[in-house]
């Protein structure tokens, strides 16, 4: 318990003191490597991620959805790394005008199509099989969301540049990230790419923690 408290203290302190995170980071020179799609496919088929639908696992989704809707009523949202569209279920209460969810796992997308079938039928929602690093569309959005996936999508600067053309004027990038020292490196890099409109941290009694943020890139 003492270690967990110390770790959370260090994570929170490193939000505005990057040097502190570097000091205490384990395996700081080992890059984050994304798991192959076959692993994700198998885990979705086995129901490993069913737990992500539980209420205690979705506080960060609800907060990010509310923050987005506060700035962009009836928002148009593109989510990269959408899995089976769990974030949309938090966004639904805010009556989004359009939601496109992209994931490279076919089982995840198929489950999302089943989960969100009523909204798909009326054209409000679209689930797409695609690689989040290279996905392309002619649609524009108020917000492009990366929920707990940005660390698996390559260089954050390249990622933001790739999706900048899909942002409407005044649009932004939305982010949720597990509160851990190595992923926070990417948050520090993302912050300097634009204006931070919102930033918050969620802690839970069971020990979970997330960063949520909205950043308007300099385009």
What does each of the following model-derived ranges do?
Residues 2-46:
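N-terminal, positively charged/glycine-rich alpha-helical extensions of SAM-dependent methyltransferases
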Residues 48-63:
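Conserved SAM-binding loop and adjacent beta-strand
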Residues 74-83:
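Conserved class I S-adenosyl-L-methionine
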Residues 136-144:
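A short acidic, Gly/Pro-enriched loop at the edge of an enzyme's catalytic core
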Residues 143-154:
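A short SAM/SAH-binding and catalytic strip from SAM-dependent methyltransferases
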Residues 158-169:
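A short glycine-rich, Lys/Arg-flanked "PGG" loop and its adjoining helix->strand segment in the class I
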Residues 170-178:
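Conserved beta-strand signature within the Rossmann-like core of class I S-adenosyl-L-methionine
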């Amino acid at each position: 318990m003492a270690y967990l408290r110390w770790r959370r203290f260090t994570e929170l302190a490193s939000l505005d003191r990057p040097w502190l995170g570097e000091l205490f980071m384990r395996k700081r020179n080992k890059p984050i490597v994304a798991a192959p799609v076959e692993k994700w496919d198998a885990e979705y088929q086995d129901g490993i991620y069913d737990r992500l639908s539980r209420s205690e696992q979705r506080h960060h989704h609800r907060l990010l959805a509310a923050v987005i809707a506060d700035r962009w009523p009836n928002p148009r949202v593109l989510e990269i790394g959408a899995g089976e569209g769990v974030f949309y279920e938090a966004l639904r209460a805010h009556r989004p005008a359009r939601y496109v969810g992209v994931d490279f796992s076919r089982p995840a997308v198929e489950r999302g199509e089943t989960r969100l079938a009523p909204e798909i039928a009326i054209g409000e929602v679209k689930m797409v099989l695609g690689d989040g690093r290279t996905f392309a569309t002619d649609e524009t959005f108020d917000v492009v969301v990366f929920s707990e996936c940005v660390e698996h999508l390559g260089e954050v600067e390249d990622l933001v540049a790739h999706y900048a053309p899909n942002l409407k004027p005044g649009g932004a990038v939305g982010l949720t990230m597990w509160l851990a020292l190595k992923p926070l490196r990417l948050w520090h890099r993302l912050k300097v790419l634009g204006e931070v409109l919102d930033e918050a941290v969620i802690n839970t009694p069971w020990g979970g923690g997330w960063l949520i943020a909205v950043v308007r890139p300099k385009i």
